[in-house]
């Protein structure tokens, strides 16, 4: 085999160690790496190796994860997958049954009567069913990115036979939670059958700690899926979010025999939760049925270490001080329609203005016109934030895709973080974020332009204190982007919407990544792909001409 070529930027030392561990464990293991340390890249490296070694010249990978994680696999695959491999990566969309049918289709099974029909933009190829409903889809053939329409119509076979193929299907963890009856079967049975039809070489569970609950539907089905697939990888930075007993449900998927007891004949049986508790929990309390402590934790750690690689951000000395991570947001059909309608409306307005200026013999680059257009283009940012402004100045909610995705990130990926900052722009956006994020174990501190100075100070001081409560600040970016020092207690900040001014973003970042910060920081950017969100973020990164790029976006023909 030719020397392996990594895709994307060079890997850090801890990522290379993680890949070596997965290889040594024959693809049965865990990457216990903190958010922002590059678990996805390591996993895609291993997936690339599977494709290169595949007897059928196609490696199939099923990824299961929470809402905030699944789109990442489609959007990051082209960056990290080896250039020696052609790749198809998809975040399955549609109803649960449509996702199930799509998964079977990717395995080559023909679906006679698809749920909801094939829909607009669907091809007739057997492996392309419901690809038009995917939340995110990316395909790269011979180093060239294929447009989504072409890929969706052909399915994975669009990759051709020139290079080994890597086919990645990512599904929301909720797909495993369904228990309703489907004829004589439960939905869990239907999902399991679909996984079998897809015939994956590897199953990956992203944010694996979400299957820690022993009795949850998702955890039990994950265990059943794991028993049918040769290779299983779990990814999480918080493997023990609450207690060492959280390990059982996760290792039931990875290696159910790891904590099992050896039988008299020398065979090791799969572990039971009862035996696991006996081995690692101190029981007491009422009638001896309450967990009052833990024991044998060195042995627990030793067994976990046999199949895991650990990376702690502040200990990865070759990591940059700050990590930028894009959080893709799949807008709803209603939000997408509102966005395209507004873009078309602005396009008509601007062209009419251009024609009037041309007739008058005046140029089109005056500052007043540019400022006016920038103000009107703010409507596009409001729409990606879930709100639609009308001509009378009234604003109504049209969806919460972004707020729900951010809430999923906070409660799933960042479940173990006690302090998190969310920066937004619009008042209604902040209200939606507050409602989606707040729960019984998370207190939201909301700060906007109307918050009294004394209340702001009190909230900032509370956030900067040693109070054990889990606190999330949701703030308008201009209210906390300067002269604030208390945010260094957080290692994660999420930009729900980005301001036009680059300096506002830089200043907001500096509130966390500054003197007094004891850990590496991660900045998350919630971006709806192919919208104004992408443009503002790219302008921030590249220091490009924002106005010119925005106008190109407005004038571009719809795809």
Can you name each region flagged by the protein language model?
Residues 1-4, 10, 28, 36-38, ...:
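Conserved Helicase C-terminal RecA-like lobe
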Residues 177-180, 242-244, 430-434, 456-457, ...:
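SF2 helicase motor core recognition
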Residues 8-25, 402:
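N-terminal pre-P-loop "Q-motif" helix
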Residues 70-138, 143, 257-258:
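Conserved helix-turn-beta segment of the N-terminal RecA-like "Helicase ATP-binding" lobe
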Residues 90-100, 173-178, 212-215, 424-428, ...:
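Conserved helicase motor
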Residues 170-178, 190-197, 216-230, 260-395, ...:
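Inter-lobe coupling linker of SF2 helicases/translocases
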């Amino acid at each position: 085999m030719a020397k392996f070529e990594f895709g994307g930027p060079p890997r850090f030392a801890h990522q290379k160690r993680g890949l070596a561990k997965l290889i040594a464990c024959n693809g049965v293991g865990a990457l216990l790496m903190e958010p922002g340390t590059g678990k996805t890249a390591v996993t895609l490296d291993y997936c690339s190796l599977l494709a290169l070694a595949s007897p059928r010249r196609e490696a199939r990978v099923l990824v299961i994860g929470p809402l905030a994680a699944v789109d990442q696999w489609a959007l990051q695959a082209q960056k990290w997958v080896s250039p020696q491999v052609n790749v198809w990566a998809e975040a399955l969309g549609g109803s649960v049954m449509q996702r199930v049918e799509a998964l079977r289709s990717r395995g080559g099974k023909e679906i006679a009567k698809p749920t909801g029909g094939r829909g607009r933009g669907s091809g007739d190829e057997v492996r392309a069913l419901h690809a038009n409903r995917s939340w995110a889809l990316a395909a790269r053939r011979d180093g060239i990115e294929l447009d989504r329409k072409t890929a969706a119509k052909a399915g994975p076979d669009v990759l051709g036979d020139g290079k080994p193929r890597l086919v990645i299907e990512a599904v929301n963890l909720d797909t495993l939670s369904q228990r309703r009856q489907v004829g004589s079967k439960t939905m869990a049975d239907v999902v399991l059958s679909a996984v079998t039809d897809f015939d994956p070489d590897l199953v990956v569970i992203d944010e694996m700690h979400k299957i820690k609950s022993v009795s949850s539907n998702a955890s039990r089905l994950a265990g059943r899926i794991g028993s049918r697939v040769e290779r299983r990888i779990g990814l999480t930075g918080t493997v023990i979010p609450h207690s060492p007993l959280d390990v059982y449900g996760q290792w039931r998927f990875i290696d159910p025999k790891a904590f099992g007891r050896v039988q008299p004949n020398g065979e090791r049986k799969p572990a039971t939760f009862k035996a696991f508790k006996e081995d690692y929990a101190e029981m007491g309390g009422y009638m001896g049925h309450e967990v009052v402590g833990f024991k044998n934790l060195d042995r627990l750690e030793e067994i976990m270490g046999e199949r895991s690689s650990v990376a702690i951000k502040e200990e990865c000395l070759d990591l940059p001080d700050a990590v930028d991570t894009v959080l893709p947001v799949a807008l709803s059909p209603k939000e997408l329609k509102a966005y395209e309608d507004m873009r078309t409306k602005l396009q008509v307005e601007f062209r009419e203005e251009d024609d009037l200026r041309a007739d008058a013999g005046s140029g089109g680059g005056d500052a007043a016109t540019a400022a006016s257009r920038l103000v009107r283009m703010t409507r596009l940012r409001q729409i990606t934030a879930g709100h639609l402004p009308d001509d009378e100045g009234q604003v109504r909610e049209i969806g919460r895709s972004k707020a729900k995705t951010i809430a999923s990130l906070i409660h799933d990926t960042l479940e173990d973080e006690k302090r998190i900052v969310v920066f937004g722009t619009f008042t209604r956006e902040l209200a939606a974020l507050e409602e989606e994020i707040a729960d019984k174990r998370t207190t939201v501190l909301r700060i906007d332009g109307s918050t009294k100075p004394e209340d702001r100070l009190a909230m900032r001081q509370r956030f900067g204190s040693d109070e054990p409560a889990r606190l999330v600040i949701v703030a308008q970016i201009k209210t906390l982007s300067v002269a604030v020092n208390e945010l260094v207690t957080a290692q994660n900040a999420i930009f729900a919407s980005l301001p036009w001014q680059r300096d506002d973003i830089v200043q907001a970042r500096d509130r966390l990544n500054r003197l007094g910060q004891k850990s590496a920081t991660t900045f998350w950017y919630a971006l709806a792909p192919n919208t104004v969100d992408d443009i503002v973020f790219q302008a921030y990164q590249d220091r490009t001409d924002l106005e010119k790029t925005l106008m190109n976006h407005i004038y571009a023909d719809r795809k």
